[in-house]
Amino acid sequence: MLTGNILDIKHLAVHDGPGLRTTFFFKGCPLRCRWCHNPESQSAKPELGLLINRCIDCRRCQEVCKLHTFNKDGKHLIERAQCTSCGRCVNACPVNALELYGTRMTLENAVADALSDQAFYRANGGGCTLSGGEPLQQSDFAAALLTELKKHKIHTAVDTCGAVPWSAFEKVLPVTDLFLFDLKHPESAAHKQMTGLGNELLLENLQKLDKTGKPIEVRIPLIPGFNSTPEALAGFADILSKLENLTSVKVLPFHHARFKYQALDMTEPLKDLAACSDELAEEVRAFFRKNNINVSE
């Protein structure tokens, strides 16, 4: 039975393509962006999250799993190296302070979930978006899900970082109406410094994708001081100006996700960086407009 590792499903989403959409967030990503606002999506494995502000120190989790401990100050700790993400503690918690990130989902259940919102798609031109993480790391499941959705004439979109083999794109091309393609930085060295990988494969895939004729919306997470410099913006403009099937560029201002990192006992890499201001985001949008590049809000 074909299954996918799904982190979350968001209904009536408005930022993941045209109209109201059902967005499937796939778990697992090849990049480790230092600004990532979904750190729970990075690992392909299920993970246990602890929302410490909800914890009431009832210790029912400890009754079902000895990997939950409390130090002398009463701090709730988890022996994560030994955790198998079985979920027993999640079920035992009376206040939902524990969450399991990632679950195996059958193709049939995923399709049924998407079809439950079909009336909204019909009303406003919405559809389904596969996001992540990186959905094309699970290209077989992604292609199968998109194929079923197209049988119901549902608009489909794939949000990708592009850091996957071209063969993964080929599997979903026939059943994808729109690609949302993330660009982080035009220079490979800077890209590698902040994401863990260079950008050669991403740009190669973007060029190949453009030649297929599929519509592409490029998305740029705007990180102050990293890719907001004049040099970086000029590099972006050069890349975008050469795309024949670019519909628009969307600027995504950096913001913090501290509670998500805390839930996983992770340190937020850019915790000391100020969030992107509205003024900077608008300056960057104006730059692209000045260079005759369509900007989506």
Language-model segments: which ranges?
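N-terminal pre-triad scaffold of radical SAM enzymes
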Residues: L7-R60, H76-S85
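Short gly/ser/thr-rich secondary-structure transition/capping motifs
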Residues: N5-L7, D73, D159-A163
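Iron-sulfur cluster-binding cysteine motifs and their immediate structural context
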Residues: R34-S41, R60-I78, R88-R104
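Conserved AdoMet/S-adenosylmethionine-binding subsite of the radical SAM
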Residues: E108-A263
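N-terminal-biased segments
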Residues: G17-P18, F25, Q42-S43, E47-I52, ...
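Auxiliary Fe-S-binding modules of radical SAM enzymes
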Residues: M1-P18, L222-E297
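Short glycine-enriched, charge-decorated loop/helix-capping segments at active-site entrances
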Residues: L50-I52, K192-G198, D265-L273
